[in-house]
Amino acid sequence: MKNPLLRPWLTEKSTGLTEQKGQYVFQVKLDADKIDIRMAVEEKFGVEVKSVRTVNCLGKSRRQYTRKGLIAGKKNDWKKAIVTLREGQSIDYYSGAAPKGEG
């Protein structure tokens, strides 16, 4: 698989996991497996991964009321991976990001 990592999943809960337990949460491709995720994190961030847990999240149903009636739809399904690193290791999400004022 090319690169299963889509983006870091930054929420209040995931930030708490990072601070307390050293676990990082990523949104990954639906067909990604734990081995691909482990290899991608180790290669991209240069850290040792202790374990990977995955969660398949179902997309929410959406309804929109218009003049012509009800339009029903659905958000896409997605998958998240909770990656635990070895002791003393950490990931800096923002190391490659440029400041907003530049470029």
Swiss-Prot record:
Name assigned to this protein: Large ribosomal subunit protein uL23
Organism: Chlorobium luteolum (strain DSM 273 / BCRC 81028 / 2530) (Pelodictyon luteolum)
Keyword Transcription: no
UniProt-listed SUPFAM superfamilies: Ribosomal proteins S24e, L23 and L15e
Keywords linked to the UniProt accession: Ribonucleoprotein, Ribosomal protein, RNA-binding, rRNA-binding
Matching InterPro entries: Nucleotide-bd_a/b_plait_sf, Ribosomal_uL23-like, Ribosomal_uL23/eL15/eS24_sf
Role, per record: One of the early assembly proteins it binds 23S rRNA. One of the proteins that surrounds the polypeptide exit tunnel on the outside of the ribosome. Forms the main docking site for trigger factor binding to the ribosome.
Taxonomic classification: Bacteria, Pseudomonadati, Chlorobiota, Chlorobiia, Chlorobiales
Subunit structure as annotated in this protein's UniProt entry: Part of the 50S ribosomal subunit. Contacts protein L29, and trigger factor when it is bound to the ribosome.
